[in-house]
Regions:
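C-terminal alpha-helical cap of glycosyltransferases
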Residues: 112-128
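Catalytic binding pocket for nucleotide-activated donors in carbohydrate/polymer assembly enzymes
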Residues: 9, 14-107
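Nucleotide-activated donor-binding/catalytic signature segment of Leloir-type glycosyltransferases, i.e.
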Residues: 1-11
């Protein structure tokens, strides 16, 4: 057996695209891009609601179909497993909702266009 110790972006993209769920139980995460990349490929994230993960993965509510993934608040195995269980319940019991969540995640605009416009507006207000 051999180990591949160098990063291959094509293989990474295949892994993102081939997965249904992306697990990211980071204890802390200033920003994080991998959950955004996962969503772009339609892979639903399960994350600890901390730092940038909390800013980019809003908790999914099956009744309103709002949200971007599944989150947990306390950094422990039980809460992480509960979030995984919620995601699997939707995946197996309501596949049509799962498909809509995955498609909605793929449609997220994660470009710099909107943030750049917002910063420009702030700068314009600051200088009068």
């Amino acid at each position: 057996a051999a180990a591949c110790l160098e990063f291959d972006p094509q293989k990474a993209n295949l892994a993102y695209a081939g997965a249904d769920i992306y697990l990211m139980p980071s204890k802390s995460e200033p920003c994080g891009l991998s959950q955004i990349i996962a969503m772009r490929f339609g892979t639903v994230p399960v994350v600890n609601a901390t730092g940038g993960l909390k800013d980019t993965v809003w908790p999914y509510d099956p009744s309103s179909e709002q949200g971007r993934g599944f989150t947990f608040q306390s950094y422990n195995a039980d809460d992480f497993l509960a979030a995984i269980d919620r995601s699997l319940q939707l995946f197996y019991d309501e596949p049509e909702k799962w498909a809509r969540l995955s498609e909605a995640d793929m449609s997220i605009d994660s470009s710099w266009k909107l943030p750049a416009q917002e910063y420009m507006e702030l700068y314009k207000k600051a200088i009068g």
